[in-house]
UniProtKB/Swiss-Prot annotation:
Lineage of origin: Bacteria, Bacillati, Bacillota, Bacilli, Bacillales
GO MF annotation: an example: rRNA binding
Family classification: Belongs to the universal ribosomal protein uL2 family.
Protein's UniProt name: Large ribosomal subunit protein uL2
Source organism (scientific name): Staphylococcus epidermidis (strain ATCC 35984 / DSM 28319 / BCRC 17069 / CCUG 31568 / BM 3577 / RP62A)
Keyword entries, A-Z: Ribonucleoprotein, Ribosomal protein, RNA-binding, rRNA-binding
One GO cellular component term: large ribosomal subunit
Example GO BP: cytoplasmic translation
Taxonomic superkingdom: Bacteria
Length: 277
């Protein structure tokens, strides 16, 4: 999809860009694949705030996505490409030969009318899902499982992809988008191709109200708060932080502080850490 630019008739529109949604072929979702999605506004079951900057936003319904791709040996036809308000990628509605309908993440290049399938015998073409042991080295993949049968967890957002680097015994080496090289069980599944909607990262929101439509509330800097509200707060004028490192609102070191647990069982599966940016 291409980006649309707007004439600067107001300050909010001056730098605003949107996607033209040229790839979207149907605007009404499949009713049988919808579920209610109540708003939480960042609160837990006790009503306490657990996630900041959440609240408001347009009403949404959840689209049930098939991340497992476990309907083997049955050809599915791409019925439509649709917008999903719950993720950055578009979704594709598949209609299987037996009449069942499922949503999948729409990879780059998938067109209405094309056929896809899943299983060890599937061809190596965009949209097909196979076990990693059946995917050739060098293939670009997305929607990668970490545990067999659990469903894809890696490389699911717009433009995301990973690459098969090699095979060692019961493991397959995968290079993730972050640069990390990781071993994943060869019986885990992945889908061929790169996730579509590559232009998503180039969209300029343009105004605060557009973030509010998405359910994103303002992010206030700690340095402009009072000292009882944030460790960075207080002082006369533009005061420095006054601590060895930046702190979270709860006094924990942040901005560069490692948050991964020291000894994690999956550490032995990471061949090379992610690149430093």
């Amino acid at each position: 999809m291409a980006l649309k630019k707007y004439k600067p008739i107001t300050n909010g529109r001056r730098n605003m860009t949107t996607l033209d949604f040229a790839e979207i072929t149907k605007t009404t979702p499949e009713k049988s694949l919808l579920q209610p999605l109540p708003k939480r506004a960042g609160r837990n079951n006790q009503g306490k705030l657990t996630v900041r900057h959440h609240g408001g936003g347009h009403k949404r319904q959840y689209r049930v996505i098939d991340f497992k791709r476990n309907k083997d040996g049955i050809i599915a036809k791409v019925d439509s490409i649709q917008y999903d308000p719950n993720r950055s990628a578009n979704i594709a509605l598949l209609v299987y030969a037996d009449g069942e309908k499922r949503y999948i993440i729409a990879p780059k290049g998938l067109q209405v009318g094309q056929t896809v399938e899943s299983g060890a015998e599937a061809d190596i073409k965009v949209g097909n899902a196979l076990p990693l042991q059946n995917i050739p080295v060098g293939t670009v993949i997305h929607n990668i499982e970490l545990k067999p049968g659990k469903g894809g967890q890696l490389a699911r957002s717009a433009g995301a992809s990973s690459q098969v680097l090699g095979k060692e015994g019961k493991y397959v080496l995968i290079r993730l988008r972050s640069g990390e090289v990781r071993m994943i069980l060869s019986t885990c599944r992945a889908t061929i191709g790169q996730v579509g909607n590559l232009q998503h990262e180039l969209v300029n929101v343009g105004k605060a109200g557009r973030s509010r439509w998405k359910g994103v509330r303002p992010t206030v800097r700690g340095s402009v708060m009072n000292p009882n509200d944030h460790p960075h707060g207080g002082g006369e004028g533009r005061a420095p932080i006054g601590r060895p490192s930046p702190m979270s609102p709860w006094g924990k070191p942040t901005l560069g502080k490692k948050t991964r647990r020291g000894k994690k069982s999956s550490d032995k599966l990471i061949v090379r850490g992610r690149k430093k940016k």
